[in-house]
C-alpha cells in the first residue's frame, strides 16, 4: 500500500466518540473495534497491512492471553510472505484466533481463514472463498529462472500442506484443487473444512 493510497483510505475511516462521565474520547473505528478484541483485515495483503495485523495480534495477546481474538477477513489475498507472517503469528500467540469471513477470502486470505482456531472459523452466508496456487513469474538468465521456479514450487508445496493441515483434506486433493482458481460458497467452504460454521446472525 502506497502512502498516497493510505492517505485516501484514512480520509474515509470513521471516528467514534465515546462519553464516560464528564469525558469524551475519540477513536478511529478500527481502534474502537480493537477494544473488543476485533482485528479487521479488509484489504489486499502486503507487508504494511501484515505488520498492522501482527502488531494488533501481539498487543491483544499481551492484554489478555486467555481471551479469544476475532479476525474478520474481507480480502482478495496478496503477498504470500506477508500472509505467512500473519499465519505464523496466529499460530504463535497463546490466544485462540477466531476467523470470520465477510465478503471474500481469496488466495492467501483463504489460508488465514482456514488457520483460525478449530471450531471457531466462520463465514457469513454470502461470503466467497477461493484457493489457488501462488502466482509468480521469472525472466532473465536461465539459472535465475531456475532458482525462482524452485522457490515458487517450495512455496506452493508449503501452502498446500498448511491447507491440508487445517482442512483435513488429503494433500493430493489440495494439490488438484489449487491447480486452478477453486471457488467455494460459504456452505462449500464448510464442507471442505476451511470454516466450521456458516452464520447469519450473532449467537
UniProtKB/Swiss-Prot annotation:
PROSITE patterns, sorted: CLP_PROTEASE_HIS, CLP_PROTEASE_SER
Catalytic activity: Hydrolysis of proteins to small peptides in the presence of ATP and magnesium. alpha-casein is the usual test substrate. In the absence of ATP, only oligopeptides shorter than five residues are hydrolyzed (such as succinyl-Leu-Tyr-|-NHMec, and Leu-Tyr-Leu-|-Tyr-Trp, in which cleavage of the -Tyr-|-Leu- and -Tyr-|-Trp bonds also occurs)
InterPro entries for the chain: ClpP (IPR001907), ClpP/crotonase-like_dom_sf (IPR029045), ClpP/TepA (IPR023562), ClpP_His_AS (IPR033135), ClpP_Ser_AS (IPR018215)
SUPFAM superfamilies: ClpP/crotonase
Enzymatic class: hydrolase
Keywords: Cytoplasm, Hydrolase, Protease, Serine protease
GO term, biological process aspect, one: protein quality control for misfolded or incompletely synthesized proteins
The keyword DNA-binding appears for this protein: no
Active-site residues per Swiss-Prot or TrEMBL entry: 107, 132
Statement: the UniProt record of this protein carries the keyword rRNA-binding: no
Listed EC numbers: 3.4.21.92
Pfam families per record: CLP_protease (PF00574)
Location(s) in or outside the cell: Cytoplasm
GO cellular component, one term: endopeptidase Clp complex
GO molecular-function terms, A-Z: ATP-dependent peptidase activity; ATPase binding; serine-type endopeptidase activity
Quaternary structure and partners: Fourteen ClpP subunits assemble into 2 heptameric rings which stack back to back to give a disk-like structure with a central cavity, resembling the structure of eukaryotic proteasomes.
Protein role: Cleaves peptides in various proteins in a process that requires ATP hydrolysis. Has a chymotrypsin-like activity. Plays a major role in the degradation of misfolded proteins.
Protein family according to the UniProt entry: Belongs to the peptidase S14 family.
Name under which the protein is recorded: ATP-dependent Clp protease proteolytic subunit
UniProt source species: Thermotoga maritima (strain ATCC 43589 / DSM 3109 / JCM 10099 / NBRC 100826 / MSB8)
Amino acid at each position: 500500500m502506497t502512502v498516497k493510497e493510505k492517505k485516501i483510505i484514512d480520509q474515509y475511516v470513521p471516528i467514534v466518540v465515546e462519553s464516560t462521565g464528564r469525558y469524551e474520547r475519540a477513536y478511529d473505528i478500527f481502534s474502537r473495534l480493537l477494544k473488543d478484541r476485533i482485528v479487521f483485515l479488509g484489504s489486499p495483503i502486503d507487508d504494511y497491512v501484515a505488520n498492522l495485523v501482527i502488531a494488533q495480534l501481539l498487543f491483544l495477546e499481551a492484554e489478555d492471553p486467555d481471551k479469544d481474538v476475532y479476525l474478520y477477513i474481507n480480502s482478495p489475498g496478496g503477498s504470500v510472505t506477508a500472509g505467512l507472517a500473519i499465519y505464523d503469528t496466529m499460530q504463535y500467540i497463546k490466544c485462540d484466533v477466531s476467523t470470520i469471513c465477510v465478503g471474500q477470502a481469496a488466495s492467501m486470505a483463504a489460508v488465514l481463514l482456514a488457520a483460525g482456531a478449530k471450531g471457531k472459523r466462520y463465514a457469513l452466508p454470502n461470503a466467497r472463498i477461493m484457493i489457488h496456487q501462488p502466482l509468480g513469474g521469472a525472466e532473465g538468465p536461465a539459472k535465475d529462472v531456475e532458482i525462482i521456479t524452485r522457490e515458487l514450487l517450495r512455496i506452493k508445496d508449503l501452502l498446500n500442506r498448511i491447507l491440508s493441515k487445517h482442512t483435513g483434506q488429503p494433500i493430493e486433493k489440495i494439490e488438484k484443487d489449487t491447480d486452478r482458481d477453486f471457488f467455494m460458497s460459504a456452505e462449500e467452504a464448510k464442507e471442505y473444512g476451511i470454516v466450521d460454521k456458516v452464520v447469519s446472525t450473532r449467537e
